[in-house]
């Protein structure tokens, strides 16, 4: 699959299987296949092909570690789902997964990955999440061909005006407006917008008894950490993983 326009990205299909030896590669169609006993299928950015071939999915150790926070009778939120590696890998352990991804091409790869994996309990949602003051149409700054690092903010640790490849208009809502309940686990990767997402999620967090939150923070965000502390969350660093934290009330 190929994107179009300035700063576009080509994609390939990655079939995750028990045997991780690559049997075939089709450069023309940008597809790699990993034996016929496939389990999950991911449409992933082609510029990261060498990494996927050599090491597998990004953050696969974190994905495996996150399984302990999923429950078959509870829901998971994947906020900043990208191509769905967390959602698809964890869906079988959850009642339902709500995967939020506002960037157009990345959202398409997410939906395609879910469809090719034939997973029925993932709801792909093309909205950005934020605070009440961010509701409406916002500008998403895209700083990478693979869709990673896209942010609503410039002049931050993630993006500045000089490294923005292009922009895209997206619609932002608060998480509370979706009225999702019975949540056990939230994975959040929203590139410096974590505080605003949580501001718009207070009722959701309360109604689900403050689920565990795995999140990325590229800099020490005192406002974010103090906000979580005020909600009685304890925040711990993830050993061996840069900039990743777990917020938990127990």
Regions found by a protein language model. Give the residues of each.
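Phosphate/nucleotide-binding beta-alpha loop and adjacent structural elements of enzyme active sites
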Residues: 3-250
């Amino acid at each position: 699959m190929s994107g179009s326009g300035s700063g576009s990205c080509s994609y390939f299909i990655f079939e995750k299987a028990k045997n991780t030896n690559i049997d075939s590669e089709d450069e023309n169609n940008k597809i790699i296949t990993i034996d016929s006993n496939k389990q999950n299928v991911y449409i992933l950015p082609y510029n990261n092909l060498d990494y996927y071939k050599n090491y597998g999915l990004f953050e696969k150790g974190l994905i495996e570690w996150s399984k302990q926070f999923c429950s078959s009778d509870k829901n998971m939120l994947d906020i900043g789902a990208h191509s769905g590696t967390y959602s698809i890998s964890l869906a079988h352990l959850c009642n339902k997964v709500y995967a939020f991804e506002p960037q157009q091409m990345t959202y398409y790869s997410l939906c395609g990955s879910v469809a090719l994996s034939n997973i029925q309990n993932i709801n792909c949602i093309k909205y950005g999440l934020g605070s009440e003051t961010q509701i409406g149409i916002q500008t998403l700054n895209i700083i990478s061909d693979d869709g990673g690092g896209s942010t609503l903010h410039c002049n931050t640790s993630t993006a500045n005006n000089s490294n923005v490849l292009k922009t895209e208009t997206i619609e932002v809502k608060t998480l509370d407006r979706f009225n999702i309940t019975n949540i056990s686990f939230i994975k959040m990767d929203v590139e410096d917008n974590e505080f605003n997402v949580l501001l718009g999620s207070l009722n959701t967090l309360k109604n689900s008894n403050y689920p565990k939150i795995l999140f990325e923070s590229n800099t020490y965000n005192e406002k974010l950490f103090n906000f979580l502390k005020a909600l009685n969350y304890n925040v711990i660093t993830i050993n061996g993983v840069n900039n990743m934290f777990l917020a938990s009330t127990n």
